[in-house]
Every structure is written in C-alpha cells, then in structure tokens.
Amino acid sequence: MGTTEATLRMENVDVRDEWQDEDLPRPLPEDTGEDHLGGTVEDSSSPPSTLNLSGAHRKRKTLVAPEINISLDQSEGSLLSDDFLDTPDDLDINVDDIETPDETDSLEFLGNGNELEWEDDTPVATAKNMPGDSADLFGDGSGEDGSAANGRLWRTVIIGEQEHRIDLHMIRPYMKVVTHGGYYGEGLNAIIVFAACFLPDSSSPDYHYIMENLFLYVISSLELLVAEDYMIVYLNGATPRRRMPGIGWLKKCYHMIDRRLRKNLKSLIIVHPSWFIRTVLAISRPFISVKFISKIQYVHSLEELEQLIPMEHVQLPACVLQYEEQRLRAKRESARPPQPEFLLPRSEEKPETVEEEDRAAEVTEDQETSMS
C-alpha cells in the first residue's frame, strides 16, 4: 500500500532536471514517453524495482552559458561591452602606489650610451669597464696586452642648434688644452684656463682633422663649464710657433661661440703675450667687435696674474712654470750694473808710474846736457 501511494505521488511531480549520468545530454522523459523511473508511461502502475527510496541521489544542474557576441563593437553582449569589464576588488590597481624607477635605476641600463656612439659595431664588452678588464676610457679598445679594437669612441654634441660628432680618440692627447680654474668673485663666475702649449703640432699629418674635433671639444666644454659670468686665461708662454692656432681657427671659434657665452665673457687674460699673438689680434680686429677687444688684457708674469685672479685651482703646465723661471732669471741678470771686462790690480799700476817718471827724468837730463 505504501509503495503504491509513493508511486502516485511521484507521478504528480514534474521533474525537469536532467540526470548527468552521461557526458552527452539526453531528452527528457516526457519527450520520449518514458517515465523518470526507467519504465514507460503505460507501465507506471507497476511498482518500481530500481528506485532506492531510502537514499537520495544528488542531482546536478546544467548551467547554460550566456550567448556571447564576438564582435569589436560595444553593443550588448559583445566582448567589449561594459558588462564584462567588472573586476574583483583585489584586482584594482592604485596608480599612486606603483613605484617608478628613479634616475639612478635608469642610468644602470643606459651607461654611457646617452651621449656616446660606437662605430663599426664594436662589441659592448670592449666599450664598458667590465670586472677584470682594463679601463678603456677613451674607447680606443686598447688593453693591457696592447691590443686595439677597430671601433672609436664618439661624443655627440649640439652647438648652435646643430648636431656634431667629436672623435675623442684623435683628441685624447690634447684634452688638457681646456681646464677649469675654479671661480672668482661672488657666485659661479668660472675661470677657464686655455693652455696653448697642449695644442697639436702643425706638422702632424692629421692636423686639420684634429683641430676640427678639438675646436668642437673646446666649444662644448665651455657650454658645460660656464653657468654665469666667466673669464678665459690664455697661457701663451712656452708655446712654439708651430703650435700657435691660426687666424682662421680663432675666427671660427669666435663665430661658433653662443651669443650667451660671448656676452657673459668678462675678461680675456693673455699671459706671456708674444709678438705673434699681438699681430694675430691686430689682424682680427675687422671681424671682432669693439666690446670683445676691450675685454682683452695682457699679463707678462704669473705674479701679475696672481694679483688679478685666485690661483688655488688654476693648473699651470710645467713648461709654463719653466718659461716663467727663465724670464725671471733673464730679468735679474739684465738688472745688474755692467762690469768692465779687464781690471788691472793696483800693485801693477805703481811700477808703471815709476817707469814713466824715470823716463821723464832721463829726457830732462838729456835736454840739459845738450844745452850745456
């Protein structure tokens, strides 16, 4: 009796959940005419033989995925619509909390590449100071064993809104031509020392090429060293004629200097001026402004220079110091009174006087004898 009532109750239940006993979906019992208990509808009055009423089977529900419109527009259901842009709270990123790299972190990857360019595909290991390798500061690739790479180190500078490249390998022996001599007065008034004795010899085979790159190096160094007003100390002493810069080179330097640098130049001190440098400046007057000519000052000794500027940080070449010492020695010798070349001792003067008196006495006696 109990089994019959349970069967009647189950007939009144509309079960639309699908049993997930198989991988593929199957039609519902009402569509095929089969009962949900495994028998046909006509055989529903018979008691079930396979249904376990004591235990409950766990049923799984089929989740149907929503229809997705795979398109690039932002219409409803599209991948780009706002319905699919919701993200959990733990995925929200605060931009202010993101750490950005500072200048020191970025420079670790740049190295010297921000201003140096390599030619002929030089390997990176030869350009950087790797641990255990010898330092190659000028990019000539020479190491401790004397070997050299094919590449050269170049520096790119901008002068007068134009980009130029400097061959640092060629001007390496002449880089001491421009040095920083400290500051004078109040503020950042720089002292730029130009030592002409470090200029290349005009008899060099690559003289014009070296002077061209050295000129760019001097101009770019001025722009880096000068912040406010400045003065140039031109050390002309101990410079042979073959190392003197030509008029064309000086003229080019003057015209390539930025207007700000020409305006901020307060004085051009020429130490140990020679007749040649005076002649060059006299010939250059037509293309040099009167204001620039008025800034030129001649100094004939280092002692006089010390009275004009502080000398604590001025690096004087050894040849200039030697030239100054020779000039001081020659000046002291010229200041001494002239001395006679031959001096007779007084002991020898007395016998000569006696002999002259004896001769005079003999002549007098002869005259008296003849008169008698």
From Swiss-Prot:
Keywords: Cell projection, Cytoplasm, Mitochondrion, Neurogenesis, Phosphoprotein, Synapse, Transport, Ubl conjugation
Function field: Functions in the development of neural tissues, particularly the postnatal maturation of the cerebellar cortex. May play a role in neurotransmission through regulation of glutaminase/GLS, an enzyme responsible for the production in neurons of the glutamate neurotransmitter. Alternatively, may regulate the localization of mitochondria within axons and dendrites.
Region of interest: Disordered: 1-58, 125-144, 330-372
A cellular component term, taken from the record's GO annotations: perinuclear region of cytoplasm
Stretches the record annotates as Mediates interaction with GLS: 190-372
Domain CRAL-TRIO: 171-328
Organism: Rattus norvegicus (Rat)
Protein known as: Caytaxin
Phosphoserine: residues bearing it: S54
Record PTM: Cleaved by CASP3 and CASP7. The potential C-terminal product released by CASP3 cleavage may inhibit the ERK signaling pathway through MAP2K2.
UniProt-annotated site: Cleavage, residues: D105, S106
GO annotation, biological process: apoptotic process; mitochondrion distribution; negative regulation of glutamate metabolic process; neuron projection development; regulation of protein localization
Location(s) in or outside the cell: Cell projection, Axon; Cell projection, Dendrite; Presynapse; Mitochondrion
Biased composition regions of type Basic and acidic residues, renumbered to the chain: 11-37
